[in-house]
């Protein structure tokens, strides 16, 4: 046997071995391997990252004279806090559109004529939805929700348009009506749960309507959720001493709904103050006492407030358990001070890193969950 003193070099590892390892890495870790050396860069080229379990933040381009025809989105990946990524050019029509909702890798967009489409910003794949038959004014925003199967591209979009709630599924050529409402009632939020095919509709009077979309004709489902409301005093540690200061600082309140991983319904009350501070209270229904009761913790879950869902967050790098991921509603979509992760344990907000906060030229922001069926490189 001939012995050799030559040391093995990690840059000379077999490409097949490298690919076996790379396929186990997250998007961020896989991206880091590409900068190690040319052989690792080559081996990683056709690798697909492992299934993504953390929300990414997508920042949409602003439509103004200083935009320099930038029709791409900026992506922030929480487990890679020092870097930003950019999508491909998504076209002028994209820059002139507004995002209404996200699901998985997909975003629901509304163009200037109030027509909707579903877009994958990572691949550029686009699904046009039925044209609207209504004479609509130019809408800057609207209430909608999205569900889509990443493989089959089956989808459901539910949209509040004028005084009606309508939906479209894959194969539909027109929008179908769920229900109509009087002008005094306004839809604040829509959450769809595909396992049960239930649609949760939250109104501005804090009431809730539940519908099942499993048939051709949607039908209402009775569930005994009593109306819920809150007053600003609920947020005061000491009502006698704190009320005056609170009123001076107060900007607005918001009430959201969310579904946990086990299917429980939560109500999330929030307050934003002039100091850019946010306060949160989370409640769930006590059916025995017939009242909403505050819960102090989400446990090993995290709440994505944009989407109205919680996700499992235990032992997942880059994902904070017992936290709320928020993109600021109407306040934060153009102000990075209101896009953050709120830690329910410490009651403190974790701001975005400098690489994101220095990206001022954006019009909107959303959390979403991209996945990869092919190499992103």
Swiss-Prot record:
SMART domains assigned to the protein according to its UniProt record, in alphabetical order: FBOX
Short name of one Pfam family: F-box
Domain F-box: 8-55
The protein's name: F-box protein At2g05970
Biological source species: Arabidopsis thaliana
